[in-house]
């Protein structure tokens, strides 16, 4: 026998079946065997460019996404490698699981990071530090106006204002002049023509580099030799000095002042710290005004916890990636104070290539727990797996410490009652006090 593999669902790819059959990992085989037909259809979907999975808590969406990655790697194994996949996730569930699966299937681990970390790295030349999302949320709890500012700065209206500002910079940011190199001269009028006509499609702050390269090419042709680096760089800098500034922090501050918003403190790079509410507006301006290195090596992007991404973040992702995507999450599990239905605005961002799939049936929790949670957040379309348990006990208390001690005594009358328990409090300060 070459390989043995049992499955309740049909998987067409012979190599994937062979690899699973050769592998003795019980965890992988058990999950594959129990995948339902509708989940298998999601895993093997290769037609839709943008696949959005709205899955209730405990519906198996993460498991489906994991197996979808494995299936795609083997379905398109000639063109898609693990290095061509990027996972944007705030937690390590993907990397922890995939680190066991992919080596067994002959693949290296896939790159995974949070989108916040990705953004912070992109802004290292703009600010020395960026505020964490959790700090932003805690500030919103203390200050309702902070929540209003954050919502505003992630909105389409704010993006439209930044777009208008970017168009105005086309003229306001520029101070054109002649540029000379030895006996060669590029006149102001020639530079303006190149800048606004020939290279109009290049982002504003990268456009002058193209003008400079044109002049350098002309010089090298006439001299019949390449200019050495020590001569090229000062020449390019002459062109870049025609910008009033190329500092995105300064430009964003200029935008805030123009539109009547509270401005950021004027500080040198090494002392700048961006509030979380400003991180993605600055990043958007950076991608709007300058040419960034293309991530052409990424052929499939996986976005986890889709409900925690703002409209602005998705607009940035669209600018950064032109590849296929698997986007998954649950609008009921957002970290925001109020639910935002990303499924309402995603089609407007990604267009007709987007297909939406809903996984409503929850398998993880008992009917009592799932029903309580659904009522708490106003979810009405959840389908429950008929597994019953103890009812949820809800109590109002005035002494949190005493209530916690009582709960511990109730949950843990002996060491064998539960393996784990969680105490959820509204902020870090309360958690530290209880610990």
Residue map of PLM features:
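Conserved helicase motor core of SF1/SF2 NTP-dependent helicases
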Residues: 78-79, 83, 92-108, 113-120, ...
């Amino acid at each position: 026998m070459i390989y043995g593999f049992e499955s309740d669902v049909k998987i067409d790819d012979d190599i994937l079946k062979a690899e699973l059959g050769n592998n003795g990992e019980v965890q992988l085989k058990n999950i594959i065997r129990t995948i339902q037909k509708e989940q298998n259809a999601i895993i093997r979907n290769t037609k839709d460019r943008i696949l959005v999975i709205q899955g209730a808590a405990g519906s198996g969406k993460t498991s489906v996404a994991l197996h979808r990655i494995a299936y795609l790697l083997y379905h398109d194994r000639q063109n898609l490698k693990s290095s061509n996949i990027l996972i944007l996730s705030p937690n390590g569930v993907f990397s922890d699981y995939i680190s066991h699966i992919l080596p067994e299937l002959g693949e290296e681990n896939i790159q995974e990071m949070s989108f916040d970390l990705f953004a912070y790295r992109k802004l290292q030349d703009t600010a020395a530090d960026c505020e964490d999302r959790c700090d932003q949320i805690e500030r919103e709890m203390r200050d309702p106006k902070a929540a209003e500012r954050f919502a505003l700065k992630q909105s389409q209206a704010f993006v439209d204002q930044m777009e208008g500002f970017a168009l105005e910079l086309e003229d306001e940011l520029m101070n054109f002049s002649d540029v000379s190199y030895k006996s060669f001269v590029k006149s102001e009028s020639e530079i303006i023509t190149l800048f606004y006509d020939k290279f109009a499609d290049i982002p504003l702050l990268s456009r002058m580099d193209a003008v400079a390269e044109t002049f350098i090419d002309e010089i090298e042709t006439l001299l019949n030799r390449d200019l050495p680096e020590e001569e090229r760089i000062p020449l390019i800098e002459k062109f870049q000095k025609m910008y009033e500034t190329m500092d995105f922090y300064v430009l964003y501050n200029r935008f805030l002042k123009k539109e009547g918003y509270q401005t950021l403190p004027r500080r040198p790079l090494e002392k700048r710290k961006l509030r979380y509410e400003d991180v993605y507006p600055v990043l958007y301006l950076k991608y709007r005004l300058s040419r960034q290195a293309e991530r052409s090596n990424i052929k499939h992007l996986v976005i986890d916890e889709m409900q925690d991404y703002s409209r602005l973040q998705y607009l940035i992702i669209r600018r950064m990636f032109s590849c296929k995507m698997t986007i998954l999450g649950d609008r009921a599990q957002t970290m925001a104070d109020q639910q935002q239905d990303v499924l309402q605005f995603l089609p407007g961002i990604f267009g007709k290539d987007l297909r939406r799939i809903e996984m409503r049936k929850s398998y993880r929790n008992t009917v009592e727990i799932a029903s309580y949670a659904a009522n708490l957040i106003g979810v009405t379309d959840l389908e429950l797996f008929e597994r019953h348990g103890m009812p949820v006990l809800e109590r109002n208390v005035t002494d949190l410490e005493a209530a916690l001690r009582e709960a511990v005594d109730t949950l843990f009358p002996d060491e064998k009652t539960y393996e784990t328990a969680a105490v959820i409090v509204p902020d870090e300060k309360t958690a530290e006090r209880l610990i």
